[in-house]
Amino acid sequence: MALSLSFIICHLSFSVACTSNDEDDIFDLPASQRLAATIDHARQVLRSAEYGWEFEYYPSATLAYGGVVYTVKFDSLTANVGCSLIADSTETSYYRLTNDNGPVLTFDTYNSLLHYFSTPNSDEYEAKGGEFEFVIDSIADDLITLYGKKTRNTMYLRRLTAAPSEYAKKTISIFDHFVDSIRGTIGTAAIEGKCNPTRRSINIVSGRDTFDVHYTYTDQGIRLYRPLRIGGTSVQTFSLDTLSNTLTCTDQGAGNVTLQGIPYASNVMSYPRYEADYAMIYGTNDTAYVHLKPNRLEGTYIMQGLSPKYDLVLRYDAESSDLKLGAQVIGTYNGNQVYWSTVNYRNGSISNIQIADEGQFTLHWNGNRFYPRLNFTATDPKESNLVNSGLLIYLYHDAEGNLTAGLLSDDEWLTNGSFLFDNLKSLNRKGRLEE
């Protein structure tokens, strides 16, 4: 049974494709009652899924972040949401089905997973182009088509056939085993493609033609945002064989398309390889023991262990395969923002204090699998921007209203009893690096 909504003019004009006598009766109702019946039907279908739905979500009108699959289980008032790229992640929040010139699904109470791309911060006042209101375009038992009210991006709810935790486990495995590049033939066209795993995009070249395609990871492989037609053949959905590194198209009419994935070279630090325990070496003879934990949703790493009060965020650079560490807000102290700032520290003197995240440090692997080390270097070596250390500061307004920086000396925030990480040298990995 399928119920399709096609918006022809504004307000309440739409057509309904029906497959039962009960649905035929809808045409005999006033427009407001027809819409109410449609919303009621949508609610019934949403709640009917035993395991919930995989929500194929694309933030940003430019598709700058590719897509992300959330898992969503609906009851009468709330939705239990998980992210397929974050293990054991679930949050429950309220949702609504409303009328705004047609049926709209709204997640209108805060959910840190689902609202990640739509929540602004000090560096992104417009957030990441995400949204939480979705116009329902069509409804079938196993597939609901929506589009973002703001971006107009097409999105899908697909009925899950297994528990969300199992779906996430398989999807994370696909992410961690994904390839550096692809090559092969689609239809009559030879193609090569370079993958960006954390931005979920592939730059495909075929002869003189170039295609930038965006995708979501699934529990089987990847699904492109829209079908790619090349060499007379359309492809969209692929399964990944992690042993042979092959991507096989599962779309009807394209089952003979198999692309060869090229794994990362052994001398390249792909995103998943950074996860480990490390000893941070700095100062004259100082060591702090930390753990790098992946955040696959962001394509970043979380450095844990410096203090119970904060963690640091490191960005993965897909082009260089390095990590970038910049100045960043890490919390509040007595109502004032606290920064892990980057500075230049020489002979007891501090200069070049920076509080904006510009990836001031590059962490580059030394190339040794048996004694792996990530060396700190200044990303910008110019003297005016040179940094070599980290410093805990907080910003406050003095008696005259001037914005002033103070050194944070509260013991709970300190590492090895100090607010200064002078002359950062390296992160020395615990254990060897597997191929």
Q: Locations of the language-model features?
A:
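C-terminal motif of bacterial Sec signal peptides marking the signal peptidase cleavage site
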Residues: 14-17
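Short solvent-exposed strand/turn elements
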Residues: 103-121, 289-294
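Acidic/polar, low-complexity intrinsically disordered N-terminal segments immediately downstream
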Residues: 19-108, 139, 151-153, 161-184, ...
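N-terminal glycine/threonine-rich, aromatic-flanked beta-hairpin/loop signature
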Residues: 60-102, 190-224, 288-341
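Bacterial N-terminal signal peptides that target proteins for export
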Residues: 1-5
